[in-house]
């Protein structure tokens, strides 16, 4: 087998025609969203009930979209693999949601949020999309307050805000450390109302396994009932994927165990381009791994960096308890290196800094894989009660997991995989390269570039679901009325079902000696080592040599007990690992081809003398949109050139 080490620069992929966002309007960036909404064709309210829209996922993006589309009059068929829509992983989001309300009159504005997001993403996001997100952020808070979301309030009753990384204003609205939960319950109650009204047909415990494409357009999905194992087809005039990101390819992440990439990857195999798969986010404040037994990591909200101070001992190998290390022997390294932003630098920078001090031998805790997040100064300044009111549930969660009281001893934290900025390529209308297939929330790549700012995931999910998609999908439905009825007997549907059943039967037939989880752990550890916080040409080539070998071994040795006609979690897991084994290869290939450092993608060969990420704008100012050809075959790279009219690329500085 030819190894990647022997390939020439372009032998492992081909470069196709450039891709353009043809729907992006021109004119001043502040007017483009209004321009696009005016240009879009509409569907008469009386005709909307004649249209069916499939929505896959019930998190913030999917729940908001399903509720809003049904409220508009469309018939919505919605799917989630959980036993209830409110079990979506959005419920785990902690710290807050950004919005340019400027309640504190501290200099915030829509333009500043736009600027901070483009800069925070290291100039690898579209200006048009980011400005739209900043505009809509203001409306999101009004929507959520109207739903009764219990945002924190100041003494006088006004909504309270706090700061997150990469900004110098206070724009993050929050509900203690449970913001995702409260926002999701708001979307869930709106969705439940439409379910009760008969406008949304909900299918829980049902997983999408393939996309049905008819005459080049998305017309339905193949799904499996996870309780009975029954394979069914569902048809619609448009399909919306709101299935989240692909962080669980790393095995250990802060994502829920069942979060997976199957929906977006199967859509990719059917023609939807996958953009910037190497742009993955590593969160700097997570509880460190405690041993090989773990299958999940736990996030500690970025909001803690408002009042907690991050430090390590100045001396290498200092194993004294934190309380015994004097102040003058502590290195508050973020405050030292980045005095303007201190502990609130963007996530990619904070994560690399933590890795660097641990690599120097100054880490704390077991194996030296941790740094301190210390609240002693905050407690002395504000009092324990005030700290408890702001962070009490997070402190309680930390103590339950670690048996350490963070009011008395510093938290120990270390970076972990948390979010994926890459995803399905979408145009300004959030439509993929498969007409009629839309991707929203973390399932797409559109708004965050190479690094997402904290508290912007909830903002994007609700912006896409409540405001953007319900406006843009009308245009598609109005311009593409489907005259042909599609049912289970259509050749495209029959073929999609056959391929799905064959894949499941093949998994069951191998009868090997290794569990799906063992393969998931192996591929995850490989990707973390070579495509994690720091990446090198040599390491990525090693990964690309090894992944096909793991994939080949998987199909020889996988063991899936039981049958496909029953509740079978081993089969569920194996089916998802199949996708991870393909997606991991594309992630590493994308990271290898992008021979620059930007945001969360850090190539050790491309850094400044100070160790910061060094972009190569003359070569890589584009979104990399990958076209699937076949498993193990060379994909096709399509480049979408990025232009910057309002926020000109510079070397990011947070010093």
Question: What would you call each of these model-derived segments?
Answer:
Residues 62:
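N-terminal Rossmann-fold NAD(P) dinucleotide-binding loop
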Residues 238-293, 297, 448-471:
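Glycine-rich loop(s) and the adjacent beta-strand/alpha-helix scaffold that form part
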Residues 140, 145-230, 235, 286-297:
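Conserved redox-cofactor binding core of oxidoreductases
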Residues 266, 273-400, 471-474:
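An anion/pyrophosphate-binding glycine-rich loop and adjacent beta-alpha core
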Residues 54-56, 234-243:
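Short hydrophobic core segments
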Residues 40-52, 65-68, 72-74, 78, ...:
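Glycine- and aromatic-enriched mobile tails/lids
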């Amino acid at each position: 087998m030819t190894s990647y080490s022997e390939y020439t620069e372009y032998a492992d992929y081909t470069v196709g025609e450039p891709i353009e966002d043809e729907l992006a309007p021109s004119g001043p960036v502040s007017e483009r969203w209004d321009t696009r909404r005016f240009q879009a064709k509409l569907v008469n309210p009386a005709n909307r009930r004649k249209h069916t829209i499939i929505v896959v996922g019930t998190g913030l993006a999917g729940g908001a979209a399903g509720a809003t589309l049904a409220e508009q009059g469309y018939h919505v068929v919605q799917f989630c693999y959980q036993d209830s829509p409110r079990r979506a992983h959005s419920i785990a989001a902690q710290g807050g949601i950004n919005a340019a309300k400027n309640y504190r009159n501290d200099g915030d504005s829509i333009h500043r949020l736009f600027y901070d997001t483009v800069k925070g993403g290291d100039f690898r996001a579209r200006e048009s999309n980011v400005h739209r997100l900043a505009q809509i952020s203001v409306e999101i808070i009004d929507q959520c307050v109207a739903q009764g979301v219990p945002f924190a309030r100041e003494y006088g009753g006004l909504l309270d805000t706090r700061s997150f990384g990469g900004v110098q204003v206070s724009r993050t609205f929050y509900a203690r450390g449970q913001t995702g939960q409260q926002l999701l319950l708001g979307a869930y109650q709106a969705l439940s109302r439409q379910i009760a009204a008969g406008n949304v047909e909900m299918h829980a415990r049902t997983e999408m396994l393939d996309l049905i494409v008819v005459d080049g357009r998305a017309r339905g999905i193949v799904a499996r009932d996870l309780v009975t194992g029954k394979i069914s087809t569902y048809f619609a005039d448009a399909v919306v994927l709101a299935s989240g990101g692909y962080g669980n390819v790393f095995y250990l992440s802060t994502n829920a165990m069942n979060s997976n990439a199957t929906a977006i990857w199967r859509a990719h195999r059917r023609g939807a381009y996958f953009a910037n798969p190497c742009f993955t986010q590593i969160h700097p404040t997570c509880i460190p791994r405690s041993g090989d037994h773990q299958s999940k990591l736990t996030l500690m909200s970025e909001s803690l960096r408002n009042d907690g101070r991050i430090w390590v001992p100045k001396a290498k190998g200092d194993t004294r308890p934190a309380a015994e290390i004097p102040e003058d022997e502590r290195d508050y390294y973020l405050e030292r290196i980045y005095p303007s932003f201190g502990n609130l630098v963007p996530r990619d920078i904070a994560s690399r800094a933590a890795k660097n001090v641990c690599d120097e031998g100054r880490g704390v805790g077991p194996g030296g894989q941790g740094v301190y997040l210390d609240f002693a100064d905050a407690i002395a300044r504000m009092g324990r009660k005030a700290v408890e009111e702001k962070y009490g549930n997070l402190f309680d969660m930390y103590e339950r997991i670690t048996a350490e009281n963070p009011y008395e001893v510093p938290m120990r934290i270390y970076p972990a995989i948390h979010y994926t900025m890459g995803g399905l390529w979408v145009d300004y209308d959030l439509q993929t390269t498969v007409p009629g297939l839309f991707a929203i929330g973390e399932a797409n790549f559109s708004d965050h570039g190479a690094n997402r700012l904290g508290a912007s995931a909830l903002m994007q999910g609700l912006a896409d679901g409540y405001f953007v998609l319900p406006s843009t999908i009308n245009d598609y439905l109005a311009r593409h009325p489907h005259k042909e009825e599609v049912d289970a007997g259509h050749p495209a549907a029959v073929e999609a079902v056959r391929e799905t059943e064959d894949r499941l039967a093949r998994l069951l037939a191998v009868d090997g000696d290794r569990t799906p989880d063992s393969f998931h752990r192996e591929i995850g550890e490989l990707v973390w080592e070579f495509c994690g916080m720091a990446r090198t040409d040599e390491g990525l080539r090693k990964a690309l040599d090894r992944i096909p070998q793991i994939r080949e071994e998987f199909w020889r040795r996988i063991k899936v007990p039981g049958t496909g006609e029953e509740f079978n979690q081993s089969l569920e897991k194996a089916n998802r690992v199949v996708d991870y084994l393909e997606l991991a290869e594309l992630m590493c290939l994308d990271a290898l081809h992008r021979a620059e450092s930007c945001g969360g993608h850090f190539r050790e060969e491309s850094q400044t003398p100070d160790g910061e990420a060094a972009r190569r704008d003359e070569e890589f100012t584009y979104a990399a949109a990958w076209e699937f050809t076949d498993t193990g075959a060379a994909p096709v790279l399509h480049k979408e050139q990025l232009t910057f009219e309002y926020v000109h690329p510079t070397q990011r500085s947070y010093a």
